[in-house]
Amino acid sequence: MSANLMMITLRLIHLIFGAFWVGGAVSVAFFILPAQRAIGQPGMLFVRQLMMGQKFRSYMIGAAVLTILSGLTMYIRYVMAGGGWAQTNTAKILGVGALAAIIAAGIGTGYTGKIGKRMLELGGQIQASGGPPTDAQKAEMGSLQGKMQSAFRIVAILLLLTVAAMASARYL
């Protein structure tokens, strides 16, 4: 594969999967999770189906991995080409954007995964009891939902900062 074709392929992977990742994170953080909290139990069932049944979480993780790996590969190829590119403002700004994306991926896969697992466990306990949730279960679920929404907002903001860095890097 020629160098140009390789870079075009990497760039397409980076842009397409990055757009999906950012759009998904922003949608979940600012629209889906707030709506889920507002409507209560039916909203929780919807989010569970979205994340587990429709495998949205898996697709988001896959998009994050492909976006980061393709971006790092392009970055390394530019650095290896020499010419002092790594010392330019463009390279530094792209590096900051990459770091923000990597942090977002860590929060989005690690921290939210732990919260989601506990939410599923608690939901299963509530369902198995056959009755309404106890006050303690309601309080814990509310706390978990708040943490999940906050984490997704942080992820979304980090990814929007990443997009801003990527879009402006060559002009600064």
Model-derived features with residue positions:
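Polytopic transmembrane helical bundles with strong interfacial aromatic enrichment
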Residues: 1-172
